[in-house]
Each structure stands twice: as structure tokens, then as C-alpha cells.
């Protein structure tokens, strides 16, 4: 028998209250208990109900909590979360037995989801960027048999787009959908420096160590790059690492780290020019790169007239404060987090003096 609406409202009100540990038994008897701990709720900035438990201290969306309850075949919570407003149709993604399917039908679920609904749930679930949520998303999506049996071309395209800054996008064509999703969540963890999630993926997927390195370089995560270089055996040359760091503009932190480890600043400048990363190009000159004429020729070949014009000026030189080759990520971050290229400033001043 389903709880009445009044019961559901009462439980929702109780879940918003602070309850002392001595009274936890009340929450357990009321069904506000999950993973051996109490359930509490709060309303986020988007006026959405968030579920907080011992496992999800930062909170997860109500719909996400519902599908997790479906995956666990927790009937009481399936009914409770549905009465609180969760979309029971999303439960279809994670049903693993007929009894739970019948319960979802009774609660109003249809027989199957449209691709658009799957994508909507994917976006709703992943939007909270925390370690616990990224790990949860991986567990929900990466090895989901349901997703293996539907056409997920649209989702693949979304993942390609979000990882467009990585130079190895073509690698994603050669792997299974499950492996692609795993790499995607790992990449998100590195991009936002989610340390608990990074450690989770590092321990569970040792064979993805190079992927972690690629993500750290491409997403300008000097902290994780330093961790990788000091705790694992890196099977990539320092100049190849610099090449990856230079593929995305304004990647000063990881470019500098590679430079400090001995990467060639001239080579980095040429790569930056080739990829039309103008801020990186200026930064490489700050680091002492002096292949001006070679870079001009390369820019001319690619039709980058603005770079040709920039490099036609004889006003560029190294910035002495960058030549100490510091490898402490905290110090690098302090040095460069608000850094404006000395050579870009020289170019700006030249333009002001000559065109105003």
C-alpha cells in the first residue's frame, strides 16, 4: 500500500528538521533511512529538492536519488521519492527485476524512455560537479546495460564536444560506449580537480593512467600533473607533454610546469602558433622562446595574418620572473593565476601608442 500524500508531506517536513542522534530511531521508523543513515533534504538555489545522506553529504538531486533507489530495488524509497515529486519514468533506466518494474508501472511509469528523456536525465544528473556525484554518475551510466541497447549517437556527440579541448578525441572512436563514459567521468574529475574522484578512478582504472595525464595537461590542472609526475611512472616525453599543454589557449600553469621540467619553449611556441593559441604564443615568448621568424612563416602558411602582424614587431623579450623553473604547484598557481603576459602587454601598449 502506497503512503498517503499527507504521510509523504509529513515525512518531507521531518526530513528538513535537525534531528539529534538520540532520535534517529524516529527517522528510521518513518522510512527516512538509507545506507544505514538518516535522510535529510534541502532546497538548492534552483528551488530543487536535494537528498542528503551519509554517502552523499553534498546532496544529490531527487530524480537521481529515485533512480538509485530503483537500482537498489528499495521499494519504500521508490514510493517516497515519487510522492515527493521525482519522475518515476527515469527509473526505467535502472530497473533490474520484474517486481520493481511492476512497482514503477503502478506509480505511473511508461514502458520505455525516449532518447531525449535519457539525455535530459544525463544532463540533470551530471550538473553537480562534486567528487561524490561524478563517481555516482560513473556508477549509474558507464556500465548500464540499458544504454548499451539504445542508440546513443547524440550522447557520443555531446561527449566529443565536451572533450573537444583534448587532442585525443579520435581515440574515443575506437573504444566501447562504456569505456568512453568512464574516460569522460575521469576527465571531468581531473578538469575540476575533484581529488576524491581522481583517486577513485586512479585505483579502479590503472590502465587509464595516460588518460589522466592527458586530461591534466589539457585542462591546465597543474596540481594533478604534479601528483602524477611524482607518484607514477610517466611514459611520455616532456616535449610531448608540452605539446598537449599547448593545444588549449591560456594553459599557462601546465605549460610552465613542462617548461620547468625541461620542455623546449621554442617548440611550444610553434605548436601554439599552429593551433592559433595567441595567449600561449605570448606566454612562450615570456618563457624565452625566440623563434619569431619561423613562427611568422608558419602563421603565414596557415593564413593567420593577425599572428604575422604581431610577430612583425621587434619588441618581445623573456620575462625574468618566469625563468626560475619552479615546480611547486602552489607557487606556480600563485605566480600565474592572475598572470598577464609581459609581451602581450608590450603589444597592447604598442597598439595604443600607434593607433589612437
UniProtKB/Swiss-Prot annotation:
InterPro entries: ASFV_MGF360 (IPR002595). Pfam families: ASFV_360. Keywords: ANK repeat. Coiled coil: none annotated. ANK repeats lie at residues 61-93. One of its GO terms (biological process) is taxis. Belongs to the asfivirus MGF 360 family. Plays a role in virus cell tropism, and may be required for efficient virus replication in macrophages. This is Protein MGF 360-3L. It comes from African swine fever virus (isolate Warthog/Namibia/Wart80/1980).
Amino acid at each position: 500500500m502506497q503512503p498517503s500524500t499527507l504521510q509523504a508531506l509529513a515525512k518531507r517536513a521531518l526530513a528538513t528538521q535537525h534531528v539529534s542522534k538520540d532520535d534517529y530511531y524516529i527517522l528510521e521508523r518513518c522510512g527516512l533511512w538509507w545506507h544505514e543513515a538518516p535522510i535529510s533534504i534541502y532546497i538548492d538555489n534552483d528551488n530543487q529538492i536535494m537528498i542528503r545522506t551519509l554517502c552523499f553529504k553534498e546532496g544529490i538531486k531527487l530524480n537521481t536519488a529515485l533512480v538509485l533507489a530503483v537500482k537498489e530495488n528499495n521499494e519504500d524509497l521508490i514510493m517516497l521519492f515519487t510522492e515527493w515529486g521525482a519522475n518515476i519514468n527515469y527509473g526505467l533506466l535502472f530497473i533490474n527485476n520484474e517486481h520493481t518494474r511492476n512497482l514503477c508501472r503502478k506509480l505511473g511509469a511508461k514502458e520505455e524512455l525516449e532518447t531525449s528523456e535519457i539525455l535530459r536525465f544525463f544532463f540533470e544528473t551530471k550538473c553537480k560537479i562534486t567528487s561524490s556525484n561524478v563517481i555516482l554518475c560513473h556508477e549509474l551510466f558507464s556500465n548500464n546495460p540499458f544504454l548499451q541497447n539504445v542508440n546513443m549517437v547524440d550522447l557520443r556527440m555531446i561527449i566529443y564536444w565536451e572533450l573537444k579541448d583534448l587532442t585525443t578525441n579520435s581515440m574515443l572512436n575506437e573504444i566501447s560506449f562504456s569505456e568512453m563514459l568512464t574516460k569522460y567521468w575521469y576527465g571531468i574529475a581531473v578538469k575540476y580537480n575533484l581529488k576524491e574522484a581522481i583517486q577513485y578512478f586512479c585505483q579502479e582504472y590503472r590502465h587509464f593512467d595516460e588518460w589522466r595525464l592527458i586530461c591534466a595537461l589539457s585542462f591546465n590542472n597543474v596540481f594533478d600533473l604534479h601528483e602524477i609526475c611524482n607518484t607514477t611512472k610517466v611514459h611520455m616525453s616532456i616535449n610531448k607533454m608540452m605539446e598537449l599543454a599547448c593545444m588549449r589557449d591560456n594553459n599557462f600553469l601546465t605549460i610552465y610546469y613542462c617548461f620547468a621540467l625541461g620542455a623546449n619553449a621554442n617548440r611550444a611556441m610553434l605548436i601554439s602558433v599552429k593551433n592559433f593559441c595567441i595567449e600561449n604564443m605570448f606566454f612562450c615568448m615570456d618563457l624565452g622562446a625566440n623563434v619569431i621568424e619561423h613562427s611568422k612563416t608558419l602563421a603565414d602558411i596557415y593564413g593567420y595574418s593577425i599572428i604575422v602582424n604581431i610577430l612583425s614587431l621587434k619588441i618581445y623579450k623573456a620575462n625574468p620572473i618566469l625563468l626560475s623553473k619552479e615546480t611547486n604547484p602552489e607557487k606556480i598557481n600563485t605566480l600565474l593565476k592572475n598572470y598577464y603576459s609581459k609581451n602581450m602587454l608590450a603589444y597592447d601598449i604598442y597598439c595604443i601608442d600607434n593607433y589612437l
